[in-house]
Amino acid sequence: TSNYFRYIFQNTQDLVPVKNELEHIKNYMEIQKMRYGDTFSYEIHAEEGTENIRIPPILIQTFIENAIKHSNTFDDPIIIRTDIAWMTAGGNSHENIQIQVMDTGCGFSEDILQSLNSAIPLEPQNGHRIGITNAIQRLNLLYGQGEAVITFSNLPSGGACVTILLPAI
């Protein structure tokens, strides 16, 4: 837990290795386990070779926080899964990294899904959408407009899925 705060307050880098970010979200999820007990669990999977790819710090946590906040009331157990894998997209010869944050909650409502996946920038509303808006803006600044892609979907089994596709650096 002190590691969690150290990462938050001492990290001034634009990009960090995936392994550092995964260690950070593990610390964050352990704090959430203390908070929610048996109604919360998590899984983290990273494909071999992705650990040294550099990504923006706190990027994954932003979407994990949203999953926890919007999943449900924790009357039913929730699982949050984070997957990181190599991905070749759109015929590009260079590789990308795909980050997925999935949960077993209630998923996105159709109007929220439509809004999140539209090309229209999100406007923060009453303290909501600030994390998502900041993440999108950071990705555009770091990688260039349209080079990093975020899509939002609902899983067939229920729950939400956020997929982030980044150039492998």
Task: Identify the meaning behind each predicted range.
Residues T1-V149, G159-C161:
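Two-component histidine phosphotransfer core
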Residues A160-A168:
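Short C-terminal beta-strand
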Residues G107, A168-I169:
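Short, surface-exposed beta-strand-loop junctions and turns on beta-sheet-rich folds
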